[in-house]
């Protein structure tokens, strides 16, 4: 099994949790980034730095992740592409992307993008705290268990 991480936008705490799970469950973690990042000095963790450019990391993830694997990402259009390919996708706050919720997630994203462009909404998501960490850990455990059963 392999877990991919869209590393540029993923909170450090979420990356660390994935590595802890990988050590216990023995799976590979692949960090994909548009810029160099630090990574744990563990054989089961790899870092792939893609050439800079719009959506380069996203395109790499869509091209290389396969059904039966999991991608951690907060990018909703990326998650949509992955779900359509049959790849499991989870955001760092513990919300799984799936075929049933993608339409709503995309519509909400597009609405907030429009509101931000009009100056009606500012800021981003709340800081990543203990509640988000616990929700992510629970969802990660649930999805990894499901994927292990399917393989």
UniProtKB/Swiss-Prot annotation:
InterPro entries: UPF0178 (IPR003791). It comes from the Bacteria. Belongs to the UPF0178 family. This is UPF0178 protein Pfl01_5469. It comes from Pseudomonas fluorescens (strain Pf0-1).
